[in-house]
C-alpha cells in the first residue's frame, strides 16, 4: 500500500510537510465544525430525533478539539480561511436545503457525502500519521461510521419517499467532492496520501451507504457517474 511505504519517509517537522499540514489540518477542523453545525440544524428539522442528533453534534465537537490538538502537537497553525473556502459550496448547498426544509438533501450532504469523505480520508491518513495524530484519528473514524449509519437508517426507513430527492441531491453535490479532492491532492500527497486511494475509499464508503439505503447496483453506478464527470 503506497501510504504505508510513504510513512517511512515522511519528515513531520519539515517545512514542506508543515505547510501542507496547515491546510489539511484546517480542513478536518472545519469539517468537524461544519458537522457540528449541520447536526444541530438537523435536530431542529427532525424533532423526533433531536436527542440523537445533538449527541452526534457533540461528538463532532470533540473531534474538532482533537484535531486542533494534532496541529498544536506539530506546532502548525491551521489555515482556516482556506478550509472555509474549501467547504463553501457544500456549506451553501446544505444551508439552502435546510432553508427549504429538504431533510433528505441535508442528510445526503452531511451523513453520506461528508461522513464518507471523512471516513475515506481518515482511513488513508492513519497509516501515515504521526503517533499523536494516529491515536486521535483512530478514535474519530470509529465515530464517523456511527454518524453515517444514522443517515443510512433514516433514509432507508423513508426510502420510497426520499429516492427522487436523493438522486437530485447526489447529482448536485457529488461532483463537488471530486473538485475538493483535486484541490487538496498535492497537499495530501505531501502527507503520504495518494489521491487515487482517497477516491477509491470514498467510492467504496459512499456506494455501501447507497446500497444500505436501498439503491440497486445499477442505480449506484449511475449515481456515481455524476462524480466521475468532474474528475
Curated annotation (Swiss-Prot):
Class in the EC hierarchy, top level: lyase
Keywords (A to Z) from UniProt: Iron, Lyase, Metal-binding, NADP
Keyword tRNA-binding tagged: no
Membrane-crossing residue ranges in chain numbering: none
Keyword Lipoprotein found: no
Annotated binding of Fe cation 2, by residue: 60, 115, 147
EC number in record: 4.1.99.5
Reaction equations catalysed: a long-chain fatty aldehyde + 2 NADPH + O2 + H(+) = a long-chain alkane + formate + 2 NADP(+) + H2O
Pfam families associated with the record: Ald_deCOase
Tree of life domain: Bacteria
Cofactor binding mode and count: Binds 2 metal cations per subunit. The catalytic dinuclear metal-binding site could be either a di-iron or a manganese-iron cofactor.
Database matches in InterPro entries: Ald_deCOase, Ferritin-like, Ferritin-like_SF
A single GO molecular function term of this UniProt record: aldehyde oxygenase (deformylating) activity
Binding site for Fe cation 1: 32, 60, 63
Membership in a protein family: Belongs to the aldehyde decarbonylase family.
Function of the molecule: Catalyzes the decarbonylation of fatty aldehydes to alkanes. Requires the presence of ferredoxin, ferredoxin reductase and NADPH for in vitro decarbonylase activity. Involved in the biosynthesis of alkanes, mainly heptadecane and pentadecane.
Xref: HAMAP family: Aldeh_decarbonylase
NCBIfam families xrefs: Ald_deCOase
Protein name: Aldehyde decarbonylase
Species this protein is from: Synechococcus elongatus (strain ATCC 33912 / PCC 7942 / FACHB-805) (Anacystis nidulans R2)
